[in-house]
UniProtKB/Swiss-Prot annotation:
Organism (species): Alkaliphilus metalliredigens (strain QYMF)
Protein name: Dihydroorotate dehydrogenase B (NAD(+)), catalytic subunit
Reaction catalysis annotation: (S)-dihydroorotate + NAD(+) = orotate + NADH + H(+)
Residue ranges crossing the lipid bilayer per the database entry: none
Record key words, sorted: Cytoplasm, Flavoprotein, FMN, NAD, Oxidoreductase, Pyrimidine biosynthesis
Amino acid sequence: MTKVNMKVNIAGVELKNPVMTASGTFGSGREYGEYVDLNQLGAVVVKGVANEPWKGNPSPRIAETYGGMLNSVGLQNPGVDEFIEKDIPFLRQYNTKIIVNIAGRTIEDYCEVVKKLGDADVDLLELNISCPNVKAGGVCFGTDPFMVEEVTKAVKKVAKQPLIVKLTPNVTDIVPIAKAAVAGGADGISLINTLLGMAIDIHKRKPILANVMGGFSGPAIKPVALRMVYQVANAVDVPIIGMGGIMTGEDAVEFILAGASGVAVGTANFINPRATIDVIEGIQGYMEQYSIKDLKEIRGSL
């Protein structure tokens, strides 16, 4: 049997394997402790944290759809101070890397969170630029290349950990957005966030979600995610974390072939709490089947 090396390097941080959780689908790991040995994961990407506690959106926030789900949780979180006090000590019990997803309503919001995390024992930061920019009339940060470069540059200036920028797919062309993030100093790119979607209750003749629209995720979005990862991998020279509809090891291998260094498992966690472990084992099985000793051999090899 081929001895396989699943280690990957994301912006100078070595992970034991490429598999991590997608932000917002795994909390800070406590909820899954009964099912998943966190020591086996390459990294835990925690639910987005903001400078102050966010209440999130009104219910209903979740709607099942064909091939996936819609969510409109609204980044409910207790704030970065509570995260530092309670969640980091919990996660540091495990031999896994910690990636903190950061939310904000203004550039200043993002920077304040990053400053507070400066001396915290975390490994990487993930900047969620799918948030609306309150100072720009609610326009999503991640849909405008100028804003993407501006917010990335500001956050990078105060960040002490490597900075990953998470891209929204709700754009005409993902490549200028990725290039803007790199121009702003991003050490890596993660994509995709959720697609904007909607579901309607035909009996009540009302939207199912209280917020009307929400983020669409699950296996149905994988072809879109793969296409965007492939495009970005061919356009920028920084590590990429690919996500969007990953349910199995085979799905993850597709993302690696498209150019991703890491892969994040999201919606699958709700269906199968052990999804991350299954994906790790699936990648390992694929490598053994094809006598692949190191993931570098196949990354971006299309």
